[in-house]
Structures are given as C-alpha cells and as structure tokens.
C-alpha cells in the first residue's frame, strides 16, 4: 500500500539543544504518525542518546534516504559523523557542523522531491557559522539554496491562524 501522507523532513538542529527533545516527544504521540511521514535528518546515535536521556520509548527506523522512510514510523537519515558527542547546552563547533550537515541533506532531498516540506529544529547561530554557512539563520540559508532569487518568508501556523515575520534577527533595544 502506498503512503500518500505528507513527507516531513525535520533537521536535527543543534545536537546539544532542544531539537531532539521536541522531535521525539512530538512523535511519541501515535496520532502524529497518522498525519505525516516524519524523516529526521541527523544521527541515529544522537537520537538514541536523547531518547534514553529523556526516558522515552519513541521508536525510529534508520534509513539511507527519505525514499526509504517507513510509513507510520519515525525515520532517521544519518548525515552526521557518528563520533560527534552530545554535551547538553554547550556550544560546540562540531555540533554546528552536524546541524549544517543535516540541513544540507534535507535541502538536497527536498530538491529531489523525496520530502514535501522542511521543518528545522533550532540551531546555535554562532557554532554553525563557517565558509558554507555565513547567514544569520536558517531562513536566509534556505532562501539562498531554494529561493531562485526570491525572498523567503517564515510563517508560523496553527489551524486557521498564521503569523508571518516582517523582520528577522533585528534586536529590540
């Protein structure tokens, strides 16, 4: 039977942050798996580490790409060095590289039509900075990779309520 649910690519974000906690707790609810086919771009080892530290039973399958995602189950595409270490709340350049690797793989598979949307977990905007990523945040990076010269707009939605951000990364003083 073919799975016609929306295929949601979810980037792991900063492995030392709240990303995996939010993802794993969200998909601990079986109802969420009825709504979509979720694919985490990240590390199965890091996901398992967070699952254990949170005492969750959220199961996932390890796949090579979103094309192998298992319906009604969380899948993880490994796009991170297996030796990366998790140190909760600690800024780390390797965690920044892992966040970027996940984002790049999600964008690649989005372009190939393997996923329908990309959801990004929070990054550390300092540790992700590199020659490949010199942007204030996800939105600008995704805009450059997928925007075809058009501007991107971040939208937050719930049912019939939508909020679009008019400015980004401008501090209120």
Question: What residue ranges belong to the model's regions?
Answer:
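Contiguous, glycine/small-aliphatic-enriched amphipathic segments in soluble metabolic enzymes
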Residues: 1-138
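Non-catalytic structural scaffold of enzyme domains
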Residues: 48, 64-68, 104-105, 129-173
């Amino acid at each position: 039977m073919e799975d016609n649910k929306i295929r949601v690519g979810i980037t792991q974000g900063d492995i030392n942050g709240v990303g995996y906690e939010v993802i794993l707790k969200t998909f601990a609810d079986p109802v969420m798996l009825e709504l979509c086919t979720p694919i985490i771009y990240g590390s199965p080892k890091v996901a398992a580490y967070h699952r254990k530290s949170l005492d969750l039973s959220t199961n996932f399958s390890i796949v090579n790409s979103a094309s192998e995602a298992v319906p009604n189950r969380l899948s993880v595409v490994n796009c991170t060095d297996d030796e990366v270490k998790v140190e909760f709340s600690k800024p780390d350049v390797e965690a920044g590289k892992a966040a970027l690797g996940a984002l790049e793989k999600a964008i690649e598979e989005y372009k190939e039509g393997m996923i329908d949307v990309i959801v990004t977990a929070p990054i550390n905007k300092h540790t992700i900075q590199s020659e490949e990523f010199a942007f204030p945040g996800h939105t600008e990076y995704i805009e450059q990779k997928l925007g075809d010269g058009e501007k991107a707009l971040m939208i937050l939605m719930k049912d019939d309520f939508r909020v679009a951000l008019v400015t980004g990364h401008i501090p209120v003083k």
